[in-house]
């Protein structure tokens, strides 16, 4: 049943609250506030009983799709199950009731947690230092780019280009532009990896850095990393790794050991914090020795005083790029990531990546006969199929397949990305899904592939069982209207 807007449920004069009688003289609002702050018309607020409000939002919540309900196969998003102990530790009064302007003397526990989290992230990725400030992955990218810029400025290098491989994460070009660089695309070869000939042709004295996602967005590990590292550093450029896909590498290999100078982590993805609906996120940045002096301030330092270990915030860093946000990062996500890492330990983190890789390859093998595979080779934690076969033979697009999947009770995968794959379906099952769940999802995808042959119109009209049917997305994009009308 379609749920009405809360404004449509409103009834004039109905109340969900009661106030005590005034114990002071009542005065008109215009005697207390300047007229410029007063409304000319009463606010259009819904009038409902408390029970009606509760039931309305409960009904809406039952319509939501989330990882606690079922598998969430969004490629490149790592929608893993988030252990509930993360929320427990985050809600501890000593953390939840803190204010970032508290004195350091009363914030030692929080400072210790952030210091130790940075140390663990350093070890996991093989980097020299880590800042926890960036609020999300793309914010971490921008931080890394500004670090690269500061490095070249100090050396007197006037470099204005950033190379971005076309299999990289989608936010890389935008971050490069925001950082003041010209973005130059490097092609992929027929295997889905960086085209070394194209890289050599575009790597010149104007290139500040190469941005690479590894594994890339078709789920393939860049096998030429040693050669890429040698070429980039030999050109006086730096090597940036987008850590969006770190869920494939934990305990197996480390970006720092591969020669990367700077990378960002997505704590909300790899280290399990809820991130559907826009956040909050956390995108810490790790750097090699050559970039440590440029890290954002304040830096958390550990020291000894009166025989006790203490922690402090140090803003006296002359070559810093400055702050990247107010205060010290999204602390609630930092607590969740810290809990996750401490619960799993080094061996557990390696099993996370091993199971993510196993799940992705198992699911791929179940689907590969039914959908085109642009790069036919083993993958890491995710894979990218193509709906080209269904489109050419039956007129069914990837968008139709994604909409039909909603009728089977699943959130759709990432579609039409990466751009190097026609009619792309990017699927990331994560390590937290059981074989039975993978099989059920595969069965749904296979059933849709069969429906494309036998009843393509059914798929083109999907979804048919959801509260909201297919929207006119083209009209919505061209005639944007986000105002509530009632």
Swiss-Prot record:
UniProt keywords, alphabetically: Oxidoreductase, Pyridoxal phosphate
Modified sites of kind N6-(pyridoxal phosphate)lysine: 269
GO cellular component: cytosol; glycine cleavage complex
Database matches in Pfam families: Aminotran_5, GcvP2_C
Classification via InterPro entries: Aminotrans_V_dom, GcvPB, GDC-P_C, GDC_P, PyrdxlP-dep_Trfase, PyrdxlP-dep_Trfase_major, PyrdxlP-dep_Trfase_small
MF annotations from Gene Ontology: glycine binding; glycine dehydrogenase (decarboxylating) activity; pyridoxal phosphate binding
Record-listed E.C. numbers: 1.4.4.2
Keyword Isomerase: no
Obligatory cofactor(s): pyridoxal 5'-phosphate
One GO process term, biological-process aspect: glycine decarboxylation via glycine cleavage system
Classification via SUPFAM superfamilies: PLP-dependent transferases
Recorded catalytic activity of this chain's protein: N(6)-[(R)-lipoyl]-L-lysyl-[glycine-cleavage complex H protein] + glycine + H(+) = N(6)-[(R)-S(8)-aminomethyldihydrolipoyl]-L-lysyl-[glycine-cleavage complex H protein] + CO2
Function summary: The glycine cleavage system catalyzes the degradation of glycine. The P protein binds the alpha-amino group of glycine through its pyridoxal phosphate cofactor; CO(2) is released and the remaining methylamine moiety is then transferred to the lipoamide cofactor of the H protein.
NCBIfam families: PRK04366.1
Subunit organization: The glycine cleavage system is composed of four proteins: P, T, L and H. In this organism, the P 'protein' is a heterodimer of two subunits.
Family: Belongs to the GcvP family. C-terminal subunit subfamily.
UniProt cross-references to HAMAP family, sorted A to Z: GcvPB
Protein name: Probable glycine dehydrogenase (decarboxylating) subunit 2
Organism: Chlorobaculum tepidum (strain ATCC 49652 / DSM 12025 / NBRC 103806 / TLS)
Gene name per UniProt: gcvPB
């Amino acid at each position: 049943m379609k749920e009405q807007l809360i404004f449509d449920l409103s009834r004039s004069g109905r109340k969900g609250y009661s106030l005590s009688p005034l114990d002071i003289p009542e005065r008109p609002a215009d005697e207390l506030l300047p007229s410029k702050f007063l409304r000319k018309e009463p606010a259009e607020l819904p009038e409902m009983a408390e029970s009606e409000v509760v039931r309305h939002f409960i009904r809406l919540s039952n319509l939501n799709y989330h990882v606690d309900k079922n598998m969430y196969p969004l490629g490149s998003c790592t929608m893993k199950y988030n252990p509930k102990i993360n929320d427990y530790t985050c809600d501890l009064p000593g953390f939840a009731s803190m204010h970032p302007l508290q004195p350091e003397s009363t914030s030692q526990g929080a400072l210790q947690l952030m210091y130790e989290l940075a140390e663990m992230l350093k070890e996991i990725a093989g980097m020299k230092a880590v800042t926890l400030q960036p609020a999300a992955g793309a914010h971490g990218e921008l931080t890394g780019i500004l670090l690269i810029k500061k490095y070249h400025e100090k050396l007197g290098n006037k470099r204005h280009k950033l190379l971005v491989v076309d299999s990289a994460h989608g936010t890389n070009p935008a971050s490069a532009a925001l950082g003041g660089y010209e973005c130059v695309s490097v092609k992929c070869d027929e295997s889905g990896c960086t085209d070394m000939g194209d890289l050599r042709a575009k790597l010149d004295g104007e290139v500040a850095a190469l941005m690479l996602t590894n594994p890339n967005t078709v789920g393939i590990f860049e096998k030429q990393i040693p050669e890429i590292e040698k070429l980039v550093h030999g050109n006086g450029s730096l090597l940036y790794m987008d850590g969006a896909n770190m869920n494939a590498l934990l305990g197996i290999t480390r970006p720092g050991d591969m020669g990367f100078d700077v990378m960002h982590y997505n704590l909300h993805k790899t280290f399990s914090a809820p991130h559907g609906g826009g956040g909050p996120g956390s995108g810490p940045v790790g750097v090699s020795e050559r970039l440590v002096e440029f890290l954002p301030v304040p830096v958390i330092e550990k020291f000894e005083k009166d025989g006790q270990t203490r922690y402090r915030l140090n803003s006296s860093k002359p070559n810093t790029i400055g702050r990247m946000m107010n205060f010290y990062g999204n602390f609630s996500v930092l607590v969740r990531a810290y809990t996750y890492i401490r619960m799993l330990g080094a061996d557990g983190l390696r099993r996370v990546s091993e199971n993510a890789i196993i799940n992705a390859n198992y699911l791929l093998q179940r689907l590969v006969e039914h959908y085109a595979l642009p790069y036919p080779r083993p993958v890491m934690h995710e894979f990218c199929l193509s709906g080209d076969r269904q489109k050419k033979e039956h007129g069914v697009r990837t968008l139709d397949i994604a909409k039909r999947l909603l009728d089977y009770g699943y959130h759709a995968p990432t579609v039409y990305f990466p751009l190097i794959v026609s009619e792309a379906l990017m699927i990331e099952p994560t390590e937290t899904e059981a074989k039975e769940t993978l099989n059920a999802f595969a069965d749904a995808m296979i059933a849709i592939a069969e429906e494309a042959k036998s009843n393509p119109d059914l798929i083109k009209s999907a979804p048919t069982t959801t509260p909201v049917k297919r929207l006119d997305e083209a009209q919505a994009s061209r005639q944007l209207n986000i105002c509530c009308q009632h």
